[in-house]
UniProtKB/Swiss-Prot annotation:
Record SUPFAM superfamilies: EPT/RTPC-like (SSF55205)
Sequence similarity: Belongs to the RNA 3'-terminal cyclase family. Type 2 subfamily.
GO cellular component: nucleolus; small-subunit processome
Protein name: RNA 3'-terminal phosphate cyclase-like protein
Main location: nucleus
Record-linked NCBIfam families: 18S_RNA_Rcl1p
Keywords: Nucleus, Ribosome biogenesis
Alphabetized InterPro entries for the sequence: RNA3'-term_phos_cycl_insert, RNA3'_phos_cyclase_dom, RNA3'_phos_cyclase_dom_sf, RNA3'_term_phos_cyc, RNA3'_term_phos_cyc_type_2, RNA3'_term_phos_cycl-like_CS, RNA3'P_cycl/enolpyr_Trfase_a/b, RPTC_insert
Length: 373
């Protein structure tokens, strides 16, 4: 493992997940100072501490030092071990917060990862498990991460503030990743969705579907929105409802949008009709931004391109989010990889907004944790 001399130093609580995930993959220790040092409630939050505990569970030999106030963190990564794991996520953030990091790390374990995560499956902050299942899994398949043991399953739904959801994620390991050329997103051919309701009337989901279809039917006939009403113990601990929509293109690109109702006891009550209409509009905005990967998974695709074989990978993205821009800076710090960024102004009227073509040469990252069979 890298010594203290090669460690990277950062300040502040922003992008904590990015730094810890890239540290784990590159083997370079990180020291993060001044984590909310001037806040009334200084130091790491519960959900960040839970994330660090999760990293500790899936690695072997990690060294984690946190000072008394929780404002300084030193993390020396161990080997990614994998295997069967269970983890109770903090209900302050969705399971998507933890799952996004696991999607980056899972292909590089020593043993295939099989993990049960408990907590909030759908909230208003993090990508829901439904969206990650519909968009991130097909994306990983493009890089050659595929197989029977590759699945993401919602066993129970949990809405904030109580949580009570349960998700099973299993992923095979790969020695190397294939380079990709994702430059033509294609045209939208179908829209699929999931309207869910827990601990409220099942009619809520049907009302969401009708209002979402009222907008989307003007553009395309092939729309199917499933309704999912979980009962009893499968419905978690709090009431709520929401909608996730995914548009699929002729070239196998998936673009997503989602909305969830306000948590119980917080904010004004949301009408299912408004939620359905607003979510449909968000999907249309995402389609306008376009690209071969939606804005939720921009950083995931850039990471997998970086870690690919020593060959050129290209991907066409919509406008880069601030999170992705910071991620590119971190990729340069941890892996010394720079992307060629070309703006592609939109010439045609009906092709949406301006695009960005990202090109890089993979570092030929080899999964050292995986044992030779």
């Amino acid at each position: 493992m890298a010594t203290q001399a090669h460690s990277l130093s950062y300040a502040g609580c922003n992008f904590l997940r990015q730094r810890l995930v890239l540290s784990t993959l590159s083997g370079r220790p990180v020291k993060i100072r001044r984590i909310r040092a001037r806040d009334d409630n200084p130091g790491l939050r519960d959900f960040e501490a839970s994330f660090i505990r999760l990293l500790d569970k899936i690695t072997n030999g990690s060294r984690i030092e946190i000072n008394q106030t929780g404002t300084t963190l030193y993390y020396q990564p161990g080997l990614l071990y994998g295997g069967s794991v269970e983890h109770d996520c903090s209900v302050l953030r969705g399971i998507g917060y933890y799952l996004e990091a696991l999607l980056c790390l899972a292909p590089f374990m020593k043993h295939p990862l099989k993990i049960v995560l408990r907590g909030v499956t759908n909230d208003q902050v993090d990508p829901s498990v439904d969206v990650l299942k519909a968009t991130a899994l097909p994306l990983l398949k493009q890089f050659g991460i595929d197989g029977e043991s590759f699945e993401l399953k919602i066993l129970r739904r949990g809405m904030p503030p109580g949580g009570g959801g349960e998700v099973l994620f299993s992923c095979p390991v790969r020695k190397v990743l294939k380079p990709v050329q994702l430059t033509d997103p294609g045209k939208i051919k179908r829209i699929r969705g999931m309207a869910y309701s827990v601990r409220v009337s099942p009619q809520m989901a049907n009302r969401i579907v009708d209002s979402a279809r009222s907008i989307l039917n003007k553009f395309i006939p092939d729309i199917y929105i499933y309704t999912d009403h979980m009962k009893g113990v499968s419905s978690g601990k709090s009431p709520g409802f929401g909608l996730s929509l995914v548009a699929e293109t002729t070239n196998g690109t998936f673009l997503s949008a989602e909305l969830a109702s306000n948590p119980q006891g917080q904010g004004a009550a949301v009408l299912p009709e408004d939620l359905g209409r607003n979510c449909a509009k968000l999907l249309l905005e995402e389609i306008y931004r376009g690209g071969c990967v939606d804005s939720t998974n921009q950083s995931l695709v850039l990471l997998l391109m970086t870690l690919g074989q020593q060959d050129v990978s290209k991907v066409l993205l919509g406008p880069l989010s601030p999170y992705t821009i910071e991620f590119l800076r971190h990729l340069k710090s941890f892996f010394q990889v720079m992307f060629k960024v070309e703006t592609k102004p939109c010439g045609e009227e009906l092709k949406g907004g301006d695009k960005v073509l990202m090109t890089c040469v993979g570092i030929g990252f080899s999964n050292l944790s995986k044992t030779l069979k």
